[in-house]
């Protein structure tokens, strides 16, 4: 196979269901055209719909797979993977397609009380990256030569080295840090949109 550049950024966000007893997910399309605040609002809206049962393809897929006898699940999964990933067809009734899992997956395990975690890439998903948020905790850190208490939020990432390497992961970490240190940047439109505005 070969690496094909995506036309858009689709962020998949893991969502707690039924008080944390189950996990589902919501997808945010064209995330590269939104500010962080717009993305957050979309996540809230889609998560509320998923929890109410109005928009939850993930849970429907899990329910469908659960009905298949265990010995045959792997065969069914491999068949779906071949149809969607290798042949490029969509199975709309199940919400499956070559881009079913989006461009990047975000999961907040801190909501389950876990300080830190590391995700494994799911081969059938074609996900190049998974970012895990841990639990925000007070930690002792050094600032201006003094030990002080600060709130620390652990972030870990798992990346597909066929698509990206340590340099790209480092650039992602650099920009996350930059945006967190300069929160006013979160309200800015992406550079691509600014350029389009200037040209128009």
Give the location of each predicted region.
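C-terminal catalytic/motor cores of large multi-domain enzyme assemblies
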Residues: 1-200
């Amino acid at each position: 196979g070969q690496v094909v550049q995506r036309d858009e950024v689709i962020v998949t966000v893991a969502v707690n269901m039924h008080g944390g007893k189950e996990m589902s997910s919501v997808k945010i399309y064209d995330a590269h055209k939104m500010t962080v605040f717009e993305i957050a609002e979309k996540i809230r809206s889609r998560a509320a719909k998923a929890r109410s049962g109005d928009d939850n393809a993930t849970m429907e897929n899990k329910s469908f797979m659960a009905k298949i006898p265990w010995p045959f699940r792997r065969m069914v999964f491999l068949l779906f993977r071949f149809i969607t990933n290798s042949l490029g067809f969509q199975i709309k009734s199940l919400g499956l397609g070559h881009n079913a899992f989006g461009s990047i997956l975000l999961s907040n395990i801190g909501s389950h009380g876990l300080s830190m975690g590391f995700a494994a890439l799911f081969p059938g998903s074609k996900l190049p990256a998974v970012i895990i948020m841990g639990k925000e905790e007070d930690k002792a850190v050094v600032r201006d030569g003094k030990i002080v208490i600060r709130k620390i939020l652990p972030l870990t990432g798992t990346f597909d080295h066929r698509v990206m390497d340590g340099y790209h992961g480092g650039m992602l970490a650099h920009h996350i840090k930059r945006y967190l240190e300069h929160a006013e940047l979160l309200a800015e439109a992406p550079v691509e949109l600014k350029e389009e505005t200037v040209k128009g």
